[in-house]
Amino acid sequence: MAAAPPPPAKNQGKAKQHVTGARFRQRKISVKQPLTIYKQRDLPTLDSNELEPSQVHHLNSNASSSSTQQPRDLHAVETGVDKNEEEEVHLQQVINAAQKALLGSKKEEKSSDMYIPTPDASRIWPEAHKYYKDQKFKQPETYIKFSATVEDTVGVEYNMDEVDEKFYRETLCKYYPKKKNKSDENNRKCTELEFETICDKLEKTIEARQPFLSMDPSNILSYEELSSYIVDQFKSAVKTSNPYIVTNGGNLEYISTTALKERLSKEIKYEPFVTIFDKNQMSTSAVRPIPKLFELFGRPVYDHWKERKIERKGKTIQPTLKFEDPNSNEKENDNDPYICFRRREFRQARKTRRADTIGAERIRSMQKSLHRARDLIMSVSEREILKLDNFQAEHELFKARCATKACKRELNIKGDEYLFFPHKKKKIVRTEDEEREKKREKKKQDQELALKQQQALQQQQQQPPQPPQQAPSKQDGTSTSQPYVKLPPAKVPDMDLVTVSLVLKEKNETIKRAVLEKLRKRKEHDKGFINLTDDPYQPFFDISTNRAEELSHIPYSSIAATHYHQFNTSNYMNDQLKKLLEEKKPLPGVKTFLGSNGELVPSKAFPHLSSLLEEKYKATSGYIERLLQSVETQDFSSYTNGFKDVEPKETNEPVMAFPQRIRRRVGRAGRVFLDHQQEYPQPNFQQDTDRVGGIPDVYCKEDAIKRLQSKWKFDTEYKTTEPFSLDPSKLNGISPSTQSIRFGSMLLNRTRK
């Protein structure tokens, strides 16, 4: 497969441009932009006529060794490698052989033998044991591996070299440790890992305490200062639960593996502490603590390390990678071949404060989750250690019982057989579980008590008020019961204080639920019917809309209009009903009764309309009469377009339709003005209307004209009528005085309740 080749050149100018520029990419390949992939069968077969002149000349030229100038290879498909690597000998031979085979050249018959030499990995290397001593594979206990990017968490950074190995064998292993007591831990010789641990501690400590040691290597800290600082740091790291330690400079450093194991071992009270990160858990020798190592091998290792440190002029003993020096010249960094990990200039992504906040929250939540997981793991470890101790104690008890049983048999002692069998363990009830159970029962009782109080309160509200005749009162002024009864504190009911706002809120919610329930039942009752009545839900109130300018809102109004012929009938007549009207078929499931005597009208086409017409329900030519007339005349255009208005419009002054379209404007001192849309021209206020011989106006005429113009902005030629929706009392024709009396009585009844 290969990337998409550039388009072929159509003329000579484009061919030259293709030779010079199209072969090399103008910009870097971006992973965000898709690249077309071609397979070998998708590539065109190029003949010598289709190739460019430079390519044909290159393929036909004899590759002689005496030629001083080697032509550049121009291929139909890019090689995909860098420009400098394209000059590699084996790559050029393979590409040229492939192109000659493509053109059908028979001169080179061994073109198939050309290949790029690569190491053969299909064979067994017999000399591998000389370089790799670890030949045996050991199955790990778990497949979980630690993917750390910092070497501090998996081992020691310091590695022994030839000088260290010579000192370790000739000096450290022969003369140390000095035998002071017979303890196995003190008599054990120093291992290579322990030697590397001591050197690593010395390297990191001197780097933190004396960062500018290379200026004067002889002024190095003494052994007493370094050892005391390292031991104190180790003890403080073991005591705390923080995996980081704070240096003198304020930097955070991760604790070493030895200190981490020591701390975890003391926390769970189990030794030795072996992790899955070790190579072989069964044979790994435990590294002794740092204080013990410095006590046994600190002085000789320090002398050896100090000598090497001074020899290196204060720099690190271990070879390190060389990075770019920001203070040096850029050309020096580019020409230095030992600099690794060179910087690449990338455009930094812009970060917002919101992104930083989200990232911090995620890191904080992840830290909490890790702390929670660590606590769970430590709890499980402690539980398993206790189980192990319990099993060991039971095993020791079992062996003691067996020995005692054998002794009883030898001495022929009988009785006390129950002592040799394990008893049934009693269930241990923890105090925490008991307290948790008590809290749960108390919470349940409190919920039941609150529910009972709420039910009693609702029953009191639903009970009707008692009539005044039943009130216990006497004319002589005596009463059967005392108005105030003093109860002891133990018998006073513990009830919450009920406020007036809470009672009114519950009452309003009860009324709202009752109204919604009635509306739901009415909706279920009217399901499957087409409502053509004047006003099924609101009280009847005839509103004349003949003079309305905009009729699109009438079918969706809260009060239905009585003049149906003024708006489109398709809003409430579906296609099925239109089809029945056109075919003169009776409506299915519809029965019509006469309004005068209740007689059933025979089933025929539109009996309900005919009965209404015979009864002369309306004297004027209304909607039903027009509908019957259109059925008789076979004119069904009114179903879609509506009936024309036959009532002449009054020529009175126009009345503004409600709602009005106005604009809200805030003036000086926070005053609010409502501006109407100026649809009519303003009169000319500047016309001189002063009469001859009249009294001259001493006030400024310009101010008066401005006031008239401002007043005209808020005026309109329509007569604004007060909408009935702003005063609900007008729906039933109630006068304002009667409405005020009704409102006062309503407030009085509410206060009594």
Swiss-Prot record:
GO annotation, cellular component aspect: NuA4 histone acetyltransferase complex; nucleosome; nucleus; piccolo histone acetyltransferase complex
* Chain residue ranges for the region called Disordered: 1-75, 429-490
InterPro entries associated with the record: Enhancer_polycomb, Enhancer_polycomb-like_N
Any idea which UniProt keywords this protein has?
Cell cycle, DNA damage, DNA repair, Nucleus, Transcription, Transcription regulation
Keyword Transmembrane appears in the UniProt entry: no
> Locations of Polar residues compositional bias?
46-71
> From the UniProt record, which GO molecular function terms apply?
histone acetyltransferase activity
One GO BP annotation is: DNA repair
Q: Which residues does UniProt assign to the signal peptide?
A: none
Where is this gene product found?
Answer: Nucleus
- The protein's predominant localisation is nucleus
Question: Compositional bias (Basic and acidic residues) spans?
Answer: 429-449
Q: Where is the composition biased (Low complexity)?
A: 450-463
UniProt superkingdom: Eukaryota
Q: What does this protein do?
A: Component of the NuA4 histone acetyltransferase complex which is involved in transcriptional activation of selected genes principally by acetylation of nucleosomal histone H4 and H2A. The NuA4 complex is also involved in DNA repair. Involved in gene silencing by neighboring heterochromatin, blockage of the silencing spreading along the chromosome, and required for cell cycle progression through G2/M.
**How is this protein organized at the quaternary level?**
Component of the NuA4 histone acetyltransferase complex.
What's the family? Belongs to the enhancer of polycomb family.
Q: Any idea what this protein is called? A: Enhancer of polycomb-like protein 1
Q: Which organism is it from?
A: Candida albicans (strain SC5314 / ATCC MYA-2876) (Yeast)
Query: What lineage does the source organism belong to?
Result: Eukaryota, Fungi, Dikarya, Ascomycota, Saccharomycotina
